[in-house]
């Protein structure tokens, strides 16, 4: 899918989602945040953002496809616009955000929306920002926002903002099943339930191994505490393995569970009629 699409005065962008392949909570920081290590992997599940220039100041936003609890003016898309407006003289815009990426899913939907808004404003108004500058602004909005400025498979450190490209062999011909039960995970509680520790082997090294080894070595540190409070998530992970997944995990702090399969697992689509489910080719 193209990153930008122009029709007349409107520009459309397609923010993509991500999954976490491995996630280790390494240490608690003095500022209250946590250092972690993970691999961000982009997946082709997209939101859609339409942007047109407006004669009115600010960012007027309509959100479709999801009932988000926050004030629309607190949405990360609007906050991204406000950050760019602080540094560049840009006009007001009218935005329609169509949510396809599930919310509170550990798939980075809101972060991706913010990053793609920054990229869209740069394109729309010919600002000429470098990727590093856009990543700087994106990082002010969320720990994983910077990843979406150039969403390629990346090893992330720090709070998720220190990025380096990573090569993962063998995923290109695989299928990804995404299952999100109708439950939400408190990120604060997920962190509270985990004692930070340095892993014996870095997830960057594990993902360089054959995928068949991941199940025994690659872990998401949030799973233990989250699965205790929301057992359905652990049950879905176990079920994906029973249906033939090579590797299954929770993404981020949840609540999406994903499985990687050799063949398209069509039975997964029918196994969870009440949950968000999707199967895509990696």
Segments (PLM) and residue ranges:
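Residue-level signal for inorganic ion chemistry
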Residues: 21, 49-51, 77, 110, ...
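ATP-binding N-lobe of GHMP and related small-molecule kinases
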Residues: 2-105, 123-132, 168-171, 180-183
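Conserved, helical-rich catalytic subdomain that frames metal- and/or nucleotide-binding sites
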Residues: 59, 150, 154-247, 260-275, ...
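Glycine/serine-rich anion-binding loops at beta->alpha junctions
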Residues: 96-125, 143, 246-258
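Contiguous, small/hydrophobic- and glycine-enriched helical/loop subdomains that border
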Residues: 114, 118-155
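Solvent-exposed alpha-helices and their adjacent loops that cap or buttress functional pockets
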Residues: 42, 139-140, 146-149, 166-172, ...
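Gly/Ser/Thr-rich beta-alpha loop segments that engage phosphate groups in nucleotides
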Residues: 24, 34, 77, 108-112, ...
């Amino acid at each position: 899918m193209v990153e930008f699409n122009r029709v007349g005065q409107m520009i459309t962008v397609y923010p993509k989602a991500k999954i976490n392949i491995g996630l280790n909570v390494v240490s608690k920081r003095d500022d209250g945040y946590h250092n972690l290590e993970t691999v961000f992997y982009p997946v082709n599940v997209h939101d859609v953002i339409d942007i047109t220039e407006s004669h009115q100041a600010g960012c007027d936003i309509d959100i479709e496809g999801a009932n988000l609890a926050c004030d629309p003016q607190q949405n990360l898309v609007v906050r991204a616009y406000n950050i760019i407006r602080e540094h560049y003289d840009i006009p007001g815009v009218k935005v329609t955000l169509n949510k396809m990426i599930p919310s509170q899913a550990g798939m980075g939907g809101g972060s991706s929306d913010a990053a793609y808004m920054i990229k869209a404003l740069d394109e729309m108004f010919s600002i000429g920002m470098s990727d590093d500058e856009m990543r700087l602004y994106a990082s002010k909005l969320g720990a994983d926002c910077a990843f979406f400025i150039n969403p390629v498979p990346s090893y992330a450190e720090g709070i998720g903002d220190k990025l380096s490209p990573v090569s993962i062999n063998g995923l290109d011909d695989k299928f990804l099943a995404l299952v999100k039960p109708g439950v939400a995970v408190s990120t604060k509680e997920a962190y509270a339930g985990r004692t930070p520790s340095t892993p014996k082997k870095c997830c960057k090294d594990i993902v360089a191994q054959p995928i068949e080894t991941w199940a025994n070595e690659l872990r998401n540190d949030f799973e233990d505490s989250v699965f205790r409070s929301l057992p359905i998530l652990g049950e879905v992970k176990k079920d994906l393995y029973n249906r033939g997944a090579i590797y299954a995990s929770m993404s981020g702090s949840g609540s999406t569970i994903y499985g990687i399969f050799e063949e398209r697992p069509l039975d997964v689509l029918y196994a969870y009629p009440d949950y968000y489910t999707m199967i895509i080719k990696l």
